[in-house]
Amino acid sequence: MPIEAMPTFWRDAELPFIEARQIEDGRKVFYGRHSHEVFSIGAVTSGQSTYLHEKSCQTISAGTVVLMNPGEVHACNPVEDQPWSYVMLYVDANWLAGIQHSHDDGDGLGFQPISATHTQSSKLFAGLIDLYAQLIDPALDALPKRKAAVAFFMLMQRTLGHSTLELKRINPRVVRAAEYINEHFMGTVRLAAICKAANLSEAYLIRAFEQQYHMTPHAYLINRRIQHAQAQLRDGASIIDIAHEAGFADQAHFQRVFKKHLAATPGQYKP
């Protein structure tokens, strides 16, 4: 893989609430449908790509900022082998909730989802690029980076935070199915057991689960295992131990699935 197509990750132990990623040439970078436990925001810095966000799919280009709330299924991929580049930030939702409620008495409300899935705001685009540059600057210590992050996400909140999400119809039995997967994803999870926990038939569960979570139960299970693997990699766990612990057949299977979801190998993601 050309060096330009290699993902670059940035993390700082003094700023555990934020992680950054950059791709300079995304022509050979392909994502499967996936979601994160954190809030994600990114900017297309050159070229264009497809942007799938739950039920919608469109082409976006340089200057576009994309936003994904925790749990929202998405994927960005190249358009017909055309070059494109981007930066991404992954932000702890609880930390972001503190920004959202810094000027009100809603400290106990938690993170409020952002309704916008993308924006052409030039201020947000420029602010995101500037924040990324400051985060990766080795000459800066943690304090100015933290201040820059607070300033940017306050700008995001002022720009987009007052819009409201369309309320989704939630089936509590389907929620119970997802909870069962979350509780047992480290072991063997069979569809029959999920159905029993949710008191739903297999046919209904598969249809209703995909409608609510934009993934099949199996895809949700694999995505949950990948989320766990990311956390373990950040903590320094070995790839072979993670593969065994998270229920993958072997290390090679884990490597393939991880790369399919995140367009990076576990070795590239690992600090």
Where are these regions (language model features)?
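Histidine-centered active-site/metal-ligand motif
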Residues: R33-H36, H74, Y204, H218, ...
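Terminal helix-turn-helix DNA-binding modules in bacterial transcription factors
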Residues: E179-A193, L200, E210-Q255, P271
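N-terminal regulatory/effector-sensing and dimerization cores
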Residues: P2-L109
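Short hydrophobic/aromatic patch on the recognition helix
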Residues: G63, Y204-F209, H253-F254, F258
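Residue-level signal for well-ordered alpha-helical positions
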Residues: V79, S102-H103, T159, Q232, ...
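Short, Lys/Arg-enriched, Trp-marked, Pro/Gly-tolerant hinge/linker segments that flank
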Residues: D107-K123, A133-A198, Q211-N223
